């Protein structure tokens, strides 16, 4: 499995506050993606050349969820690997698909979350 990115993602109903906090810490907003899965907006923030954090606005979340965002070259391979290790997709087998990506949130048996994603290359 080839991993292409690895960084934290904060899924929250209060993205504006969290994005503002990271911007005050010196992170710069690189891009914003809207309409993910219908109503989620994701912000990619970068600090220098070394550090990234993603913040996703999800109004249906009762509280913040911090996960590890893992981008891979082969989504199906990584999804199957993680589910074979006991990770569960809380949405059943639902995969979020946009014109540029595929993603799913997977929860480990001990409760930590991985936001698995694949960036569709053109």
Language-model regions: role of each:
Residues 4-14, 32, 43, 60-122:
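Vicinal oxygen chelate
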Residues 35-37, 59-62, 96-99:
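A short beta-turn/loop motif at secondary-structure boundaries
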Residues 57-62, 120-122:
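A short, sequence-level motif marking secondary-structure junctions
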Residues 20-24, 81, 110:
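Structural preference for long, well-ordered alpha-helical segments within the folded cores
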Residues 6, 53-55:
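Extended, well-structured beta-strand/loop surface patches
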Residues 49-53, 111-114:
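Short, charged/polar, Gly/Pro-enriched secondary-structure boundary elements
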Residues 2, 9-50:
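Core segments of cupin and vicinal oxygen chelate
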